[in-house]
């Protein structure tokens, strides 16, 4: 659910509430010389320490090579791998974790879904939409710190909330397969430790960019056809 804060506009069509649930250790972005070649080297070097999925690796290299993030910290959500990768402004991987994503498969959101009470969102519409989004920190109606991906659509990154379902969610994250990580209303919800240690310092201090990779079409198609045009409209 959304709350007070500045309105945001997604850079691609379709959005719904994103919540990240994950746990992982934080990395530190090392200083490196300016320039695209150096940034791409950082992406390649870090893959050995925190293996990127093939799709996330392709996306990260494309983003840095095209400077699509315009020097802002950015995150990549790989729904198929159920994993979140956070990068610093130079393209250095600073943290990664398993993630819960929308329980329904699909890359698009139904208009108005973000305005519904959680219990009223149809099962088929509980998707995590793919695309490129400008992010900004804020607070929801309960005063909880979140990272808004699209405020008007209620799309945000936030901590897992303490309730009866928390233990089950942690079990899903701890499992060896990403198949049981399709468990949110469409949100991306992270474990408090990961949110506080990685999301807050890198995406919670100012503007950023969140890339949600598609699951119904090739990732190369998303970046080859959409990103070059979208990058002209960076926040």
Walk through the language-model features, giving the residues of each.
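N-terminal, Lys/Arg-enriched amphipathic/low-complexity engagement segments
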Residues: 35-54
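Bacterial N-terminal signal peptides
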Residues: 13-23
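Exported/periplasmic cell-wall-interacting domains
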Residues: 2, 32-33, 126-235
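Bacterial N-terminal signal peptides that target proteins for export
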Residues: 2-15
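Gly/Pro-biased beta-strand-loop elements
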Residues: 55-168
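Signal peptide processing junction and immediate N-terminal pro/mature segment
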Residues: 25-37
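Residue-level recognition of short, well-ordered coil/turn positions
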Residues: 8, 24, 203-206
